[in-house]
């Protein structure tokens, strides 16, 4: 089911009693060190992207991260046309949820891609699991999109090892 949780998460409460979630730190052990990497790309990758805009000036353009060479877009739409929140996070065409806290002027999205399964967590609050079919094993590019009107944006990526290679 698209709402399933396949990777372990650590749950906690914010000072305002909001449920927070993040991938468990043990998953970092799957990261491949840079000196061990080759440049062939990977269908198993971890992405940490941060976006910031001027306070009170939410961007009118959709922005976010493109994974699997554009097969899947994970991003934020701040058009303000949503009842739940001025900004909504989305993953592909099938998943959408509010960017919280509501008055924020930044978004951090943590993504783990495991072949066709893509898990995304926005601001340690809103999580989504989506599925995408890459056109080939070489279509692995990761990039930011829609960042021209933002104050700042950054991205970190790590290729990942197999967790259960029996």
Positions of PLM-derived features:
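Beta-rich accessory regions
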Residues: 1-166
